[in-house]
Each structure stands twice: as C-alpha cells, then as structure tokens.
Design a protein with these regions (language model features):
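RNA pseudouridine synthases
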Residues: 1-327
Length: 327
C-alpha cells in the first residue's frame, strides 16, 4: 500500500487527472475500476474520480510493489541541459518571474536545444514543493530572439492562476523595440492576424474602418499600442503594449505599417550593428487588482533595464540612452 498526501501545489486538480499522471502507464479504465473496487481510496472512502483535491487530502493505493512500479513506469534520469541561466526577478512558492536572455528558447523545440523550461525543471528538481504529478512550466512564451520577462509556474495553483491572467487579457505586458524609420507620438494598431505555419511567418492586414470582418473565419483580431520613447533620423525606440498576444504580433504589426524591427530580416528589417541587432524586450509586467490566494501580486509591477548590448546598439543607431529614460 502507498499513501499520498496532497500538498498545496497539487490542490485543485481532479482526482482522476492526478491519478492518470501519477500512474502514467495505467489505462483510464483500469484507474476507474480500481476506484470502484476501493483499491484506490480518497480520505479512506470510495471516490468516483471527479472529486477536486484539497491540500491535506490522503490517497491510498492498495497495489503490490510490482504492480505499482509497473504502472508508475521506469524512472528516467533527468537531462542535464547546457544553457545560460536566466536571472530571477521574483519568486514565491507558486510562481517565478525570470529575465530570459536573447538567444535562449522559452520551450524546447525540434532542435532539442536547451530552454527556459529545462532550466526551470532543473531549478525546481530539489525543491520540496515539486511533485510527480505536476511539471513546472513556462506560461508566456517569448521568441528565441526576444529577451525579457517570462512567467513560470512552480505549482498547479500557480499554473492555473497565470493561465487565467494571460487568457483574460488583464495582465499588462509591455515591450521595448528598436524599429526602422522615424516615428513620432503614439498610436493604436488593429488588424487581422494570419499565420503561415509552414514558413513560420505572420501577416497582419489592417481592419477596414477599424471594425473586424465577422465573415473572416481565418483571421484573428490583434491589437497593439505603441508610443515613441526616442527617435533619430533612421531609427526609433518604441514602447509597446500588447492587448492580444499572438505569435510574432509585434514584429508583424510594426512591419505592416512600414517600420519593421531593425535586424528582423524575416519581416523586412535590415542589420544594424556588428553583433546582435534585433532589439525586442519584454521589459515590464503589471498585475491587475487581485483578491484571494494571489492577492500578494495585486497591482504589482515588475520592470527590468535594457541589457548592456542593447544600450550599445542604441548608441550605434544614434539614440542616446539618456533619452530613453525609465519607460
């Protein structure tokens, strides 16, 4: 017999989903049969599987050691990845906010290169709050060449909270970008977003009269706000706020108005500087008013400075850092 005590990180999950992750090789039909026969019990009583787990709940599994080992699966040694570790900006028992450097993937892709997710799981591996039924994960993915703030969940409760904040478009997400051409003032950009998956390229078409086409079932509405921080003859540094959050949204939206990111070849930009030239940084995250379990984050604002290489790039482009100020 094995006894499992539910900790805070796993609270809120359905019992059957928890068991499917814990007994990863067991068919769902087998798990439900074991529940009916009381070979698996919740708080010493029969359970159906749809119960929501609470911190302190006890699950008892009446299997032999061999049966339990079979359905648990063979332990696989964790991969030790090689990466540039991101700096931690904020951490509590449920979430992490890190500063991802340019060039590091947020999540692993087909290339198998290391990512923020790899670092996160290594970082949390020896944490007493980690479990076999929840894998810490990145919640807002940034492109490889985009640097800045990435939200990560350490627990199930943290994952659910961050997912709700992102899906509800209540989280303030602000970026800095170096774009080609001279811009002045501020503007709101609205359009329909289309993605060519094969080419991994996005196009955004301006909405006629500012009203979405309800008959267009393929295009997705996107909205980007920008204001100019500093401008020179050939370049401008802008602050952008995402109302929606689609893949390549900033890159494609700025390109659609004739001001692509400097160095963003895919969207029509040209190289600027000898080393890295694409400057797109997620530099500020603002939480809305929050009550309940995560009220500690209510109204909190997290902000990071430009990396040194970006300051040098702005100087090359004729934008003095003193002009950028604290945006």
């Amino acid at each position: 017999m094995q006894e499992l005590v539910i900790e805070k990180k796993d609270a809120g999950q359905r019992l059957d989903k928890y068991l499917r992750k814990y007994l990863q090789n067991a068919p769902s039909s087998f798990i439900y049969r074991m529940l009916r026969k009381k070979n698996i019990v919740l708080n010493a009583g029969r359970a159906e599987g749809k119960e929501l787990l609470c911190e302190g709940d006890t699950i008892r599994i009446f299997f032999s050691e061999e049966t339990l080992a079979h359905f648990r699966g063979t332990e696989v040694a964790a991969k030790t990845a090689s990466y540039t570790a991101p700096d931690i900006v904020y951490e509590d028992e449920d979430i992490l906010l890190v500063n991802k450097p340019s060039g590091l993937l947020s999540q692993q892709d087909k290339s198998g290169e290391a990512s923020v997710n790899d670092w996160l799981r290594d970082y949390c591996r020896n944490d007493t709050g980690t479990s076999d039924t929840f894998r810490p994960s990145v919640c807002n993915r940034l492109d490889r060449n985009t640097s800045g703030l990435v939200l990560c969940a350490k627990t199930y409760a943290g994952s659910r909270f961050l997912s709700e904040q992102i899906a509800g478009h209540e989280l303030g997400k602000y970026y800095r970008a170096l774009v080609e051409g001279r811009l002045e003032g501020e503007a709101v950009l609205r359009g329909l977003w289309y993605k060519d998956e094969a080419a991994n390229r996005v196009r955004i078409e301006k909405i006629k009269d500012g009203v979405p086409d309800t008959e267009d079932t393929e295009g997705r509405y996107v909205e980007t706000h920008y204001r100019v921080i500093a401008s020179a003859e050939s370049y401008s540094l802008v602050e952008l706020r995402l109302v929606t959050g689609r893949s390549h949204q900033i890159r494609a939206h700025m390109a659609s108005i004739g001001h692509p990111l400097a160095g963003d070849i895919k969207y029509g930009g040209h190289p600027c500087g000898k080393e890295r030239s694409q400057l797109l940084q997620a530099f500020r995250i603002v939480f809305p008013e929050i009550s309940g379990d995560f009220s500690r984050l209510s109204g909190k604002c997290f902000e990071i400075p430009l990396p040194p290489w970006a300051e040098k790039l702005l100087a090359v482009c004729g934008l003095e850092t003193e002009k950028t100020g604290r945006v």
